[in-house]
Regions:
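Aromatic-enriched alpha-helical transmembrane segments of multi-pass intramembrane proteins
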Residues: 117-118, 141-235
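Membrane-cytosol interface segments of multi-pass membrane proteins
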Residues: 1-163, 291-333
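Hydrophobic, well-ordered secondary-structure elements that form the walls
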Residues: 267, 278, 319
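Juxtamembrane "helix-exit" motif on the non-cytosolic side of transmembrane helices
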Residues: 27-31, 100-105, 166-175, 224-234, ...
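Hydrophobic alpha-helical membrane segments
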Residues: 270-283
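Alpha-helical transmembrane segments and terminal signal-anchor/GPI-anchor hydrophobic tails
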Residues: 185, 203-265, 283, 288, ...
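Interfacial loop-to-helix transition and helix-capping segments at the boundaries
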Residues: 39-51, 115-129, 168-190, 224-250, ...
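Hydrophobic transmembrane alpha-helices
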Residues: 60-64, 134-143, 187-203, 247-261, ...
Length: 333
């Protein structure tokens, strides 16, 4: 039986991803909104929580099933490759071609460079190989019982936290980001948080003092977000470096929440399909509205978000009718 609170968080997380993509990560993408528009400020908040929350939920779901080495590493990798890498290749190829052929889209690629989308991070699909690598790392650590107690988990999480902070600096800055391994390093601590919130829920959440400390540190994240917005430059870079320190307790508290909402639970049940296909809706929605002569920001934001959310749900239902299409584009048997 599904945990409705976590499914609610999953629905919220994927909606944040969609809205963030509609707005765009910078003035040159998405709706091409420049500073200091309020939607740019909104994106700073979305960017803070969207992927860490998505990753923590993935870790929580992984930990639901007790680890068993008897199933074998090969079997585990095949299942995760089917679920993550096959759709990455299929949907990524389709997205590349549509973006290349359709007028009015952002960041068109060259056909001669299409091979790169299977080897290096490509637009929103960077996350899928990153998550695949994270699953492989987690399986390997579990096979050696490195995370079967809170103490061992804390050591592993600290190591992951250090790796995430040195990610893309020093020597790593010069290393090609093959298979989105840098994204995996950046998201690894949050996956570990999800694992711990499932495996060690009683010692984590049973003490009020622990929860109070978590809340206090999590609230400091609000101050970091304001620094990133109001003091761009070195102060913002330092604040972003500290993001995981405030994000980790925030994620623990969110995963422990008991609130649920039927609408978000429903959206959450299609989260993976929405992630795979929402890029078509965000781009297509903006283009269609502009062709209709609609340039107002709010109608474009709401309409593109609606299309990018509901469209993939319809695509999911359509593809699910064919075994081959279901496997290629949704990663389901």
């Amino acid at each position: 039986e599904k945990n409705l609170s976590v499914e609610t968080l999953r629905g919220i997380a994927i909606l944040l991803v969609v809205v963030g993509h509609v707005v765009g990560s910078g003035p040159g993408g998405g709706m091409k909104i420049d500073f200091p528009h309020p939607l740019r400020y909104l994106y700073v908040w979305i960017d803070y929580i969207q992927m860490p929350l998505f990753t923590a939920i993935a870790g929580w779901a992984y930990a639901l099933k007790p680890f068993s080495a008897s199933s074998g590493f090969g079997s585990f990798v095949r299942k995760k490759a089917l679920r993550l890498l096959v759709p990455m290749a299929a949907v990524g190829t389709l997205y590349f071609l549509v973006q290349y052929l359709m007028p009015g889209t952002n960041n068109k690629g060259e056909l001669s460079q299409m091979w790169r989308i299977y080897v290096f991070p490509y637009t929103i699909y960077w996350y899928l190989p990153s998550l695949f690598l994270i699953f492989v790392v987690q399986w390997w650590m579990d096979s050696r019982k490195w995370m079967d107690t809170p103490g061992k988990w804390a050591v592993c999480c600290m190591a992951a936290l250090i790796l995430s902070r040195i990610n893309d600096v020093w020597i790593l800055h010069e290393v090609p980001d093959l298979f989105s391994f840098k994204g995996a390093l950046g998201q690894l601590p949050y996956f570990f948080v999800g694992v711990a919130s499932c495996r060690f829920a009683v010692p984590l959440y049973s003490r009020p003092a622990v929860r109070h400390v978590m809340l206090a540190v999590a609230l400091c994240g609000i101050a970091l977000i304001q620094t990133v917005w109001f003091y761009p430059g070195k102060c913002a870079s330092l604040s972003m470096l500290l993001y995981p320190v405030t994000l980790i307790p925030a994620l623990f508290l969110l995963l422990a929440s008991k609130w649920h909402n039927r609408f978000f639970v429903w959206i959450g049940s299609y989260a993976y399909s929405i992630y795979l296909f929402h890029g078509f809706g965000t781009s297509g929605g903006r283009i269609i509205l502009k062709m209709m002569g609609i340039d107002a920001i709010v109608p474009i934001l709401l309409s593109a978000t609606f299309i990018a959310t509901i469209g993939p749900v319809l695509v999911d239902k359509l593809l699910d009718r064919s075994g081959m299409l279901r496997m290629l584009f949704l990663g389901r048997k």
